[in-house]
Amino acid sequence: METLAQHRQARSSAQKVRLIVDLIRGKKVPQALNILTYTNKKAAFLVKKVVESAVANAEHNDGADIDKLRIKKIFVNEGSTMKRMMPRAKGRADRILKRTSHITVIVSDR
C-alpha cells in the first residue's frame, strides 16, 4: 500500500532540499530517519517531518508495519517565490528572491 505526505511552501529552495532528498531515496524508513537525524542542514529537518508524517499516515490509515516501510518515491518541486526589495546606495534597490519548495514523500510496504 502506498501512502503520501506533502509539505507545500517549505521555506527552503528546491536546490537545497534536493541535496538531502538524494541521500534517502529508496532506503528503508528507519535508516532514512537515522540519516536525516544526523544531517546538519535545515532541509534535513523539513524532509524528516514529511517522512514522519508519511509513516504516521501509513500506520493510521492503512495499518502498515513501520519496519517494513520503504521510501518508494520522494521528490521536490519549486514552490512560489516571494519577492522582496533591499535598499541600496543612491536610491536604488535590489530584488531579493525568497524561494520555497514542495516536498512530496510516498512510502510503500512493498
From Swiss-Prot:
A molecular-function term among this protein's GO annotations? structural constituent of ribosome
- At the top level, the lineage of the source is Bacteria
Transferase: is it a keyword of this entry? no
Q: Does the keyword Kinase apply?
A: no
InterPro entries in the record, alphabetically? Ribosomal_uL22, Ribosomal_uL22_bac/chlpt-type, Ribosomal_uL22_bac/org-type, Ribosomal_uL22_CS, Ribosomal_uL22_sf
Name the PROSITE patterns for this protein.
RIBOSOMAL_L22 (PS00464)
List the Gene3D superfamilies hit by this protein, alphabetically: Ribosomal protein L22/L17
Q: How does it assemble?
A: Part of the 50S ribosomal subunit.
Its annotated function is as follows: This protein binds specifically to 23S rRNA; its binding is stimulated by other ribosomal proteins, e.g. L4, L17, and L20. It is important during the early stages of 50S assembly. It makes multiple contacts with different domains of the 23S rRNA in the assembled 50S subunit and ribosome.
Task: Tell me which family the UniProt entry assigns to this protein.
Answer: Belongs to the universal ribosomal protein uL22 family.
Instruction: Name the chain's protein.
Output: Large ribosomal subunit protein uL22
Source lineage: Bacteria, Pseudomonadati, Pseudomonadota, Gammaproteobacteria, Enterobacterales
- Gene name? rplV
